[in-house]
Each structure stands twice: as structure tokens, then as C-alpha cells.
Design a protein with these regions (language model features):
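Short, polar/charged, low-complexity connector loops/linkers at domain or secondary-structure junctions
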Residues: 64-74
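Hydrophobic, well-structured mid-protein blocks that either form specific transmembrane helices
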Residues: 23-63
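Acidic, serine/threonine-rich low-complexity disordered tracts
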Residues: 1-33, 74-156
């Protein structure tokens, strides 16, 4: 779960709750509270980190920020963000790789393929879906995950 708001035209996370369950066992249970106006964040009511950016994002809200930034700057090749997780605050880059036609549910979708070396993932953004990721591919040492957008409803 990710909760945030826009401050001075920047998306900011305020609360990030991540629970990972594998084979019925809780693997991760992290709660991160971010105080953008005070420039710090706290994880699990224990560790405190200073924030250094006008916008600190979590692992979910970074995709909203990327979608918004690509809409504003479609010709930009690299987008950089400060992203917080249980390990701390890290710089994350999304680099434009190429344009790609993908197929989801037998529908051809024109997309921009972006790569994030830090997150070990690639994603496809589509103008038809307000540049939200329509496919996210993540490969780590043990697993390969693919998330595919299954529903999209634009708010009025």
C-alpha cells in the first residue's frame, strides 16, 4: 500500500506498507513513514533516514511519477528519482531503450520500453494508458516476475 500527495508539483510518498508472503509465510513486513516537510523518513518505527530530495518516492509511487514526467517530457531519455525501501534511500534511473509494439489480450499497444538497472527491471509505458506501465518485467537472481495491466479506467 502506498499513500502520497503532491507538494510543490512533485509527487511525494508519505506512507508505504509492504508485506510479502511466500508459501504462507511472511517474508517481509515493512512500514515506512515519510515526512517530506521535515526531510526524514522512518522505517518500522526504528531507523531514521534523512531525505535529500524535493520528492522521495516508494517502490509503487515511482511509477506514477515516471508516468507524469514522461507526459511532460516525452523526448527525455533518462528520468532519475530518490526511492525509499527497507534498505534506505537510493537513486533510481529509468532509461528509454526503444519503441515497441506489444500485445495484451490480443490488442496491439504502442509503447516506450524503459530500463531501470537499479531495480533490475524493464517496463513498457503506453500513451494510450497515460504512460502508466502496461508491462513490468523484473528479473532477480532467483525469480522472474511479469506484471501486466489488466484494467484501466481513466478518472473524469
Amino acid at each position: 500500500r502506498s499513500i502520497g500527495l503532491k507538494i510543490d508539483n512533485y509527487i511525494n510518498s508519505q506512507y508505504y506498507d509492504l508485506v510479502e508472503i511466500s508459501k504462507g509465510k511472511i517474508e517481509k513486513n515493512n512500514k515506512i513513514r515519510i515526512y517530506p516537510d521535515k526531510n526524514y523518513a522512518i522505517i518500522n518505527s526504528e531507523k531514521r533516514w534523512e531525505t535529500i530530495s524535493k520528492s522521495t518516492l516508494d517502490e509503487l509511487s515511482v511509477y506514477l511519477a515516471l508516468a507524469e514526467d514522461v507526459q511532460k517530457n516525452p523526448n527525455q531519455d533518462v528520468f532519475t528519482y530518490q526511492v525509499i525501501d527497507e534498505k534506505g534511500i537510493n537513486q533510481v534511473n529509468f532509461k528509454f531503450e526503444n519503441y515497441e509494439t506489444i500485445i495484451i489480450n490480443n490488442i496491439e499497444i504502442e509503447s516506450m520500453k524503459m530500463i531501470s538497472p537499479e531495480l533490475e527491471l524493464s517496463l513498457n509505458l503506453s500513451k494510450a494508458f497515460n504512460f502508466l506501465p502496461v508491462i513490468i518485467n523484473r528479473v532477480n537472481k532467483k525469480n522472474h516476475y511479469q506484471l501486466t495491466l489488466s484494467q484501466f479506467k481513466e478518472l473524469p
